[in-house]
């Protein structure tokens, strides 16, 4: 049996929602124990995860430093959190397997999700992310190409597209590793939203992919028998 375990971003934080490094490591250890128990029953497990709180932390760093250094684009934030959480989860998985006498290799893949450049969400971004800011602070980020909306008394808030994922571009690598016996962490945060240009080249775009759509697409792509969604 092949299972896709989709961990929400909040499942990678403490019970009260804090996302300090030690909180995320502790949460990963809890999730890894459950995965190792499935592996001990000869169940194939692929792990994917959200990254909302983690990207949120990076956005705050962007906001605080925007007057000094250019903000890191959202697709780069997604790539950074995929790598960080992938590393944390691999360490936790290997420790949990060792405790149970299991010897399985692990791998974490920075994964891209193909979206349509003409998706209507890009023309009218519907997804609010990050903190509310006063107009003068939001204006600095608008100068760097971000889209912010006036939300009245609360202040200004950034909005981004939420396109439908069409394809997990790195699914063949995920499938090959799973078939070779690896416990794989992949498609974190729904994958890095990526568009294909007319010349065939690929380009990351600033967007957020719905967590349920991304998990369902990955499960179908990998031929998973079961999709498990873990939350806090």
Task: Describe each model-derived feature in a short phrase.
Residues 6-8, 48-49, 105-112, 186-188, ...:
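Short beta-strand segments
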Residues 34-41, 88-98, 217-225:
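Alpha-helix C-terminal capping segments
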Residues 191, 222-232:
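Glycine-rich phosphate/pyrophosphate-binding loops
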Residues 1-48, 58-59, 63, 176-181:
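N-terminal glycine-/serine-/threonine-rich phosphate-binding loop
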Residues 21-24, 60-70, 123-131, 199-207:
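A glycine- and small-aliphatic-rich helix-loop capping segment at beta-alpha/alpha-beta transitions
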Residues 6-13, 168, 175-213:
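Catalytic-site beta-strand/loop segments enriched in glycine and acidic/polar residues
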Residues 64-184:
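Ligand-binding beta-strand-loop-alpha-helix segment within the catalytic cores
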Residues 24-31, 72, 200-226:
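Gly/Ser/Thr-rich active-site loops/lids in small-molecule metabolic enzymes
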């Amino acid at each position: 049996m092949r299972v896709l375990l989709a961990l929400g971003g909040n499942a990678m934080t403490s019970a009260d929602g804090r996302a300090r490094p030690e909180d995320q490591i502790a949460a990963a250890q809890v999730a890894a124990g459950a995965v190792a128990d499935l592996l001990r029953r000869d169940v194939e497990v692929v792990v994917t995860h959200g990254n909302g709180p983690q990207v949120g932390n990076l956005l705050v760093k962007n906001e605080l430093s925007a007057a000094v250094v250019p903000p890191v684009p959202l697709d780069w934030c997604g790539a950074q959190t995929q790598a960080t959480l992938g590393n944390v989860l691999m360490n936790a998985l290997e420790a949990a397997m060792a405790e149970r006498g299991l010897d399985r290799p692990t791998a974490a893949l920075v994964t891209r999700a193909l979206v349509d450049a003409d998706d209507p969400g890009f023309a009218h971004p519907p997804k609010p992310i990050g903190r509310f800011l006063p107009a003068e602070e939001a204006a600095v980020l608008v100068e760097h190409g971000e889209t912010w909306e006036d939300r009245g008394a609360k202040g200004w808030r950034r909005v981004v597209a939420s396109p439908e994922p069409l394809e997990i571009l790195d699914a063949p690598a995920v499938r090959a590793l799973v078939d070779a016996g690896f416990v794989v962490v992949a498609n974190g945060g729904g994958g890095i939203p990526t568009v294909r240009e007319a010349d065939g080249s690929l380009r990351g775009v600033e967007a957020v992919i719905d967590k349920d759509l991304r998990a369902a697409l990955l499960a179908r792509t990998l031929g998973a028998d079961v999709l498990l969604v873990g939350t806090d």
